[in-house]
């Protein structure tokens, strides 16, 4: 199947992209050659499809941003496909549990999202001075506040996931959900190498395979379709040598169980009398 098949299948949908923590900062570096989900958005719009980034202060609390995602879904003119990375996936998931939001969604593709939290967030918030500094920076830059990082801790996420377990199971039975994780074993380039030390630390701490920020086990929702690939925490959303974020997204969109449109009916030509 080709890009033409994707155009035909999703012509009436709106794609909503939810960025991760500090995503608006990364997106702002596009003029200096940094890609963060923009190549995926541009590919979709290049196919003539409706694709938009949800405007979120990414350091804000998950619940606050979930309301913003829900509003974006409700404002869409038709059916929606949610594509989210990292913290953005937590907000998309929470939005889908709100009244009438899931009913408008035909798919949720979650890329490297810490549904069960991140040990790195635990470590950062365990240092009071660093926690206060992060909170102040977030407030001064308009990105949110320190609560957004606190929402990524393993304790906070475990509590939230347990409280919403039945709702999540019902959601996955209703909406096609794909969760993608990556694991960093041998960094292929300097971008993945940035996460190498964190990855080794998490393995030594007993967290298992991970992408440098999120353990594989944290990124996979029970009952959803699972995909595990190689790479660091931005490997699936950043175009670079050896990376193919568009190819990853293309593959997952083609696998969403959405009926393809029927081909045009043939024109019957009766023989002349």
Predicted segments with their positions:
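Short aromatic-enriched loop/helix-cap "lid" or pocket-rim segments at secondary-structure transitions
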Residues: 28-30, 119-124, 129, 188-194
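C-terminal catalytic-base region of ester-bond hydrolases, centering on the histidine
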Residues: 172-273
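Short amphipathic alpha-helices and their capping/turn segments at secondary-structure boundaries
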Residues: 1-10, 97-100
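Short catalytic/ligand-binding loop motif for oxyanion handling, primarily in non-cytosolic enzymes
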Residues: 24-26, 61-62, 91-92, 116-120, ...
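Glycine-rich His-Gly loop
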Residues: 19-21, 85-86, 113, 182
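Serine-dependent carboxylesterase/thioesterase catalytic core
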Residues: 51, 63-167, 211
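Active-site catalytic motif of lipid deacylating hydrolases and related acyltransferases
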Residues: 8-78, 139
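Hydrophobic/aromatic beta-strand patches that form the interior of the parallel beta-sheet core
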Residues: 16, 52, 107-109, 178-180, ...
């Amino acid at each position: 199947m080709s890009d033409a098949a994707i155009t035909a299948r999703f012509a009436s949908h709106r794609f909503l992209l939810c960025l991760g923590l500090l995503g608006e900062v990364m997106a702002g570096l596009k003029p200096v050659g940094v890609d963060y989900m923009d190549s995926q958005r541009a590919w979709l719009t290049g196919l003539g499809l409706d694709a938009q980034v949800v405007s979120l202060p990414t350091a804000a609390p998950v619940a606050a941003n979930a309301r913003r995602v829900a509003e974006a879904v409700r404002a869409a003119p038709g059916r929606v496909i949610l594509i989210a990375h990292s913290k953005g996936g937590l907000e998309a998931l929470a939005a889908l549990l709100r009244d009438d939001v899931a009913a408008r969604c035909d798919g949720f593709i979650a890329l490297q999202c810490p549904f069960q939290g991140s040990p790195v967030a635990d470590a950062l918030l365990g240092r009071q001075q660093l926690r206060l500094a992060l909170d102040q920076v977030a407030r001064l830059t308009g990105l949110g506040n320190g609560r957004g990082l606190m929402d990524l801790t393993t304790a906070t996420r475990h509590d939230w996931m347990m409280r919403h377990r039945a709702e999540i199971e019902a959601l996955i039975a209703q909406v096609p959900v794909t969760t993608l994780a990556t694991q960093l074993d041998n960094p292929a380039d300097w971008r993945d190498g940035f996460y190498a030390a964190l990855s080794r630390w998490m393995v030594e701490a007993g967290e298992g395979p991970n992408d440098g920020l999120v353990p594989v086990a944290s990124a996979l929702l029970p009952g959803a379709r699972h995909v595990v690939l190689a790479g660091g925490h931005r490997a699936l959303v950043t175009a670079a040598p050896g990376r193919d974020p568009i190819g990853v997204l293309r593959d997952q969109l083609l696998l969403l169980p959405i009926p393809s449109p029927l081909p045009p009916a043939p024109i019957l030509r009766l023989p002349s009398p």
